[in-house]
């Protein structure tokens, strides 16, 4: 394991006792929780909030994360670092008039002192008017991205808006064989939580989206969004339905360390069970001391209309 602190390799200066890396999607921040024995060089590093930490290990590269908490605990130091700087936790209220999604992303990223990027979502998507309601930058951006059919990921110094369909459309990074008797896997399907459709309605516009794989009439109506025309209402309805229904089929797995399990990665599952098929990783946890990996995946869905 190679541990970089502020860009310097300090692997030989510390004795790491615990190192867990959590790689997530859905507006949450990647996280490293690391403990090492007391080092007499520690004070010489002059640790400060938002110092950068990066770990590379056997094919896994966490990218840059930012020190959030530094705690001395029983002769050890514990560091918690996250994928976004501390400024990203500051809540604020703001309004945006005649702005594109790309412009809003740049403004919020600048507020956090980070970079930004959009993948599978148009930066030119226009918002005649949008309000940020006492939200952190990351919470606000994730709310917008959910409506646009994506999610926010804070990774390697960058606020990334990633489209769900974009992630689903990528080539599988690996194929995992799963047997019915495998104790380290749990498959869950909850058809009762799916919506057959959703309607976005405002004083100015109304539009609906539907999931062709769902029977019944479970169709909520959302009246709290500032849709100003039918195209915007329809786009938001589709994004909300996609993000909700994809959570109905979930697969949780534990295995030996697998560096290829990363959030938003496309995975093929080969199995004689109902879990067979195409999935997208939602969250992974890698224990770099015990060399174990766990992952939660959501089924790819292509039935939203």
Name each region found by the language model.
Residues 1-88, 181-182:
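Assembly/oligomerization scaffold segments
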Residues 36-39, 82-86, 162-168, 259, ...:
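Secondary-structure transition/turn motif
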Residues 44-55, 89-99, 177, 263-270:
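Extended Gly/Ser/Thr-rich low-complexity repeat segments
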Residues 34, 93-117, 132-156, 200, ...:
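Amphipathic, non-transmembrane alpha-helical segments in extracytoplasmic/periplasmic proteins
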Residues 31-35, 54, 64, 78-80, ...:
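Beta-strand secondary-structure signal
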Residues 2, 154-156, 163-246, 250-293, ...:
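Acidic, small/polar-enriched beta strand-loop surface segments
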């Amino acid at each position: 394991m190679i541990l970089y602190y502020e860009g310097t390799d300090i692997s030989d200066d510390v004795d790491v006792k615990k190192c867990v890396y959590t790689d997530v999607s859905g507006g949450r921040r990647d996280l490293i929780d690391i403990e090492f024995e007391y080092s007499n060089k520690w004070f010489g590093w002059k640790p400060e909030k938002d110092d950068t930490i990066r770990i590379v290990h056997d094919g896994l590269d966490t990218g840059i994360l930012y020190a959030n908490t530094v705690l001395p605990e029983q002769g050890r130091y514990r560091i918690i670092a996250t994928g976004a700087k501390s400024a990203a936790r500051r809540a604020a209220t703001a309004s945006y008039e005649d702005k594109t999604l790309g412009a809003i992303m740049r403004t919020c990223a600048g507020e956090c002192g980070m970079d930004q990027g959009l993948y599978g979502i148009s930066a030119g998507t226009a918002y005649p008017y949008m309000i940020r309601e006492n939200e952190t930058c990351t919470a606000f951006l994730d709310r917008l991205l959910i409506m646009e059919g994506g999610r926010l990921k804070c990774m390697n110094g960058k606020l990334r808006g990633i489209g769900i369909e974009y992630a689903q459309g990528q080539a599988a990074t690996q194929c995992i064989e799963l047997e019915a008797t495998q104790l380290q896997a749990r498959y869950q399907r909850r058809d009762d939580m799916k919506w057959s459709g959703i309607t976005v309605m405002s004083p100015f516009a109304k539009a609906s989206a539907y999931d062709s794989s769902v029977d019944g009439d479970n169709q909520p109506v959302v009246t709290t969004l500032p849709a100003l025309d039918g195209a915007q209402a329809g786009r938001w309805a589709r994004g909300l339905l996609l993000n909700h229904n994809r959570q109905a089929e979930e697969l949780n797995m534990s295995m030996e360390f697998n560096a290829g399990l990363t959030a938003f990665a496309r995975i093929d599952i080969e199995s004689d069970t109902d879990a067979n098929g195409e999935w997208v990783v939602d969250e992974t946890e890698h224990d770099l001391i015990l060399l174990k990996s766990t992952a939660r995946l959501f089924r790819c869905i292509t039935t939203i209309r």
